[in-house]
Amino acid sequence: MEKYLIELLETNNRVIVPDLGAFIIRQQEPQELVFNDLLAFNDGMLTAHIKQLEGISMSKAQVKIEEFVDQVKKILTNGDIFHLENLGFLKMDDSSKIEFSVTK
């Protein structure tokens, strides 16, 4: 999933992972990648990207996203950190809010 997120962030300033949140590139100098767990609606962009690259149906692409989100939430709920290769990591704070830190 990280590969798809990175590909989309190369041409978009926001990528929403449905039911998880959005990765957003702030356009100030220096550019910064942030995460907003309030933007978790399905805008279809990630699903369509996976569909196109893998040659699968929209529903199968959506299932891939749902499985990824379930995996992330399970790890975070257990108090562990979820690493997003070449992006950073997600963790849950004491108030159950998902936080993102960029890999340095």
Residue spans of the language-model regions?
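Cytosolic/nucleoplasmic/matrix-facing N-terminal domains/tails
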Residues: 1-104
